[in-house]
């Protein structure tokens, strides 16, 4: 799989012969499309597409408007049109999950087939303490260990004596690499994004699988489940994974892949 750059945006356009389907991946906040290379390896008979949005991977930020959700929706629509993508499974993690849902209100109905969500941004984010959300990009005096525990279940036990050093290293990396993204964590910005995501959830009319870690400290499980139940949409399956926080694919890959395999068989 080859990463390309065009007009400052890094992307993957990787069709396969005799494909079983098409997957477009939408990365999480401060993540990038390489986060799911192992997922793509598992589903290697599917064509794979993805964009690194401005400020992520090797995609550049030319102006602040490129960090707006509406801009991400627009360039994704252009990407789909340029590559003539049809019947795509929209797969998103965290903010990428919110983007995947919002796109169902933005793409034409023949451009997408189903939605796969991993701990997606949804209106339940209001139940997460604001200091947790805003410290996803830390300040020098932030306790980044708290954030790591929200992201990965039992991470302190998993890393043992290396935990403190790991947190400091990740903190410094984020401070140096991600500061320009911090505007995306402002309450007013999140509110605008949630309005778009909620509107799309309310109208969602394609099969969807929503996978959420029960110990998620970023987008909490119980409020997310309550929001899902309020939708009363039989097209959406909601599946919880134990011993997983905000990254269930990496924390419990076999359970995650089993759920996805079943879903892909259902929609094939």
Curated annotation (Swiss-Prot):
This protein's UniProt keywords: Hydrolase, Serine esterase
Hydrolase among keywords: yes
Family according to the record: Belongs to the lipase/esterase LIP3/BchO family.
Catalytic residue list: 27, 94 (charge relay system)
One Gene Ontology CC term in the entry: membrane
Enzyme class, UniProt record, top EC level: hydrolase
GO molecular function, one term: lipase activity
A Pfam family this chain is assigned to: Hydrolase_4
InterPro entries (UniProt xref): AB_hydrolase_fold, AB_hydrolase_sf, Hydrolase_4
EC number(s) per entry: 3.1.-.-
Protein name stated in the entry: Putative esterase/lipase 1
């Amino acid at each position: 799989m080859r990463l390309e750059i065009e007009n400052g945006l890094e992307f993957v356009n990787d069709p396969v012969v005799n494909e079983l389907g098409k997957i477009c991946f939408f990365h999480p906040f401060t993540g990038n499309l390489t986060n799911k290379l192992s997922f793509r390896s598992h589903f290697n008979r599917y064509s794979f597409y993805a964009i690194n949005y401005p400020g992520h991977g090797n995609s550049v930020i030319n102006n602040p408007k490129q960090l707006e959700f509406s801009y991400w929706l627009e360039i994704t629509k252009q990407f789909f049109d340029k590559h003539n993508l049809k019947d795509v499974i929209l797969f998103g993690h965290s903010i990428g999950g919110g983007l995947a849902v919002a796109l169902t209100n933005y793409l034409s109905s023949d451009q997408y087939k189903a939605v796969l969500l991993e701990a997606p941004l949804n209106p339940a984010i209001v139940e997460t303490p604001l200091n947790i959300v805003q410290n996803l990009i830390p300040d020098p005096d932030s306790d980044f260990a708290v954030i790591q525990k929200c992201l990965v279940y039992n991470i302190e036990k998993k890393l043992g004596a290396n935990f403190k050093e790991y947190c400091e290293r990740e903190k410094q990396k984020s401070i140096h690499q991600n500061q320009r993204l911090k505007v995306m964590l402002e309450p007013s910005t999140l509110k605008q994004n949630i309005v778009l995501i909620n509107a799309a959830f309310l109208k969602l009319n394609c099969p969807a699988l929503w996978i959420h870690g029960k110990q998620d400290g970023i987008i909490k499980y119980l409020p997310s489940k309550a929001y899902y139940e309020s939708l009363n949409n039989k097209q959406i399956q909601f599946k919880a994974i134990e011993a997983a926080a905000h990254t269930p694919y990496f924390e419990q890959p076999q359970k995650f892949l089993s759920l996805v395999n079943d879903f892909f068989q259902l929609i094939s």
